[in-house]
Amino acid sequence: MKHIRNFSIIAHIDHGKSTLSDRIIQICGGLSEREMAAQVLDSMDLERERGITIKAQSVTLDYHSKDGQTYQLNFIDTPGHVDFSYEVSRSLAACEGALLVVDAGQGVEAQTLANCYTAMEMDLEVVPVLNKIDLPAADPERVAEEIEDIVGIDATDAIRCSAKTGVGVPDVLERLVRDIPAPEGDPNGPLQALIIDSWFDNYLGVVSLIRIKNGSLRKGDKVKVMSTGQSYNADRLGIFTPKRVDRDVLNCGEVGWLVCAIKDILGAPVGDTLTLTRNPAEKSLPGFKKVKPQVYAGLFPISSDDYESFRDALGKLSLNDASLFYEPESSTALGFGFRCGFLGLLHMEIIQERLEREYDLELITTAPTVVYEVITTNQETVYVDSPSKLPALNNIEELREPIAECHMLLPQEYLGNVITLCIEKRGTQTNMVYHGKQVALTYEIPMAEVVLDFFDRLKSTSRGYASLDYNFKRFQTSDMVRVDVLINNERVDALALITHRDNAQYRGRDLVEKMKELIPRQQFDIAIQAAIGNHIIARSTVKQLRKNVLAKCYGGDVSRKKKLLQKQKDGKKRMKQVGNVELPQEAFLAILHVGKDSK
């Protein structure tokens, strides 16, 4: 056991952790030259296209150290994006140490900080690494100071390397073996294994990634899932080298995969503990804190025949992604679908794209909303995650919206722009600290504003230099109203949105103008209105298409013309009574972009 090292890499997006992991795999000979591909561990097509890591992956490598010993390195890759921070905490729970990779040109960013604190809270050994020293803009001295100043760990002897060229990577491995402690645990005790991640394989059923804390697990053992109490047979187990390799036994301290032919998706929840049926452990390992979704949106299949396969797809995806929440929902405009909860907008996009790609579905998304806390007039507290569930205005005592605490790190010269943006988003400043040329800002901003487009706007006002980390702080009373959209005097539930009263007027106007461009012209006038309760705040009309009925009259008598025009008018009136309007998918997406271009 003393030759096992379990570690993961923490870094901000684009600081080079996937490239560094490629190099480590290469040095340890995990893959032959032919099989080496850039970003070996980003196995999802989506991950490769966007160049981000979404899912945690694991690899077991043998490293021949300079002291003549052979060490087994278990390396768990983690994502860097703010929406996937819960993935990071799961990966870290299985490790004893972490490499903190910082770009020597860019310096410390908010996300690095957040993940680094998570690692420190779990008492992991954090080893700082300065990457990209081959770049002309690299300034390792300054960045080392920043690490000490902002993160507060000793970085005087931080390793300098360039994952791209391979310089300094062997030093990283030596330092790993030296500084990161070996796993602790009792090899002869009862088995306790932590489920770090699970995913669904069409042939094998549920595959779980596990870390053995105590005891050992052999092929053919009967294992028990501690939360459900159900027993399964350990059919196959092994390690990733990144390829799946079968083994007969997983020893104490190792990280590997396990297949128990579990067909039920909820059979092995992430964060659960496995133990042996014949010699069970007394208590389960501390799991992970449940993540609360911050953003909710309705997802509906375009054709209602897809509903069943959509439900199965969501089930399989939620196994792989513990933070995805969903419940059935029906809408008069869109039929049957699901209300889904996500961690942020990127998470929502990724899930929608994965559903469309991996499961071949066509989906419509409604506008994302956050969860509001409503105190009704008879003093009940209700949580509302969709505008259609909001009680009538006269039943609401007070409406509270979620406030997010946003930590931003940015260069001084962009401070003015960022503060202006935060004020526009109804934020209040709680803290501001200068670290050299960087400024650490803390603002409390309503979650609805953060979720909408705050991240994009922050990046654009600061030319991409500012970085953001946010978490839910509390609910706060606020003057929020529901803006309904009426098309030909009928409410369309899927288009409603909840917004602050001050913004309601112009968001309503913006929305009806956008809808006017997107709804195709019909044979009759279509009135699009935005309303708060019964009070109409904005209206626009999609003009009808009409045939020139007078074309065949030539000279003709005026009464003849009047008769023809009146006949056309009556016909249009009749059409309007029975006609209904087809809304294109773009119309639903219009809400997502309300207020984005106009500012």
From Swiss-Prot:
Q: Which GO terms describe its cellular component?
A: plasma membrane
Q: Which Enzyme Commission number(s) are on file for it?
A: 3.6.5.n1
Keyword field: Cell inner membrane, Cell membrane, GTP-binding, Hydrolase, Membrane, Nucleotide-binding, Protein biosynthesis
Question: What family is reported?
Answer: Belongs to the TRAFAC class translation factor GTPase superfamily. Classic translation factor GTPase family. LepA subfamily.
Family matches, as NCBIfam families: lepA (TIGR01393), small_GTP (TIGR00231)
What function does this protein fulfil? Answer: Required for accurate and efficient protein synthesis under certain stress conditions. May act as a fidelity factor of the translation reaction, by catalyzing a one-codon backward translocation of tRNAs on improperly translocated ribosomes. Back-translocation proceeds from a post-translocation (POST) complex to a pre-translocation (PRE) complex, thus giving elongation factor G a second chance to translocate the tRNAs correctly. Binds to ribosomes in a GTP-dependent manner.
According to UniProt, the name of this protein is Elongation factor 4
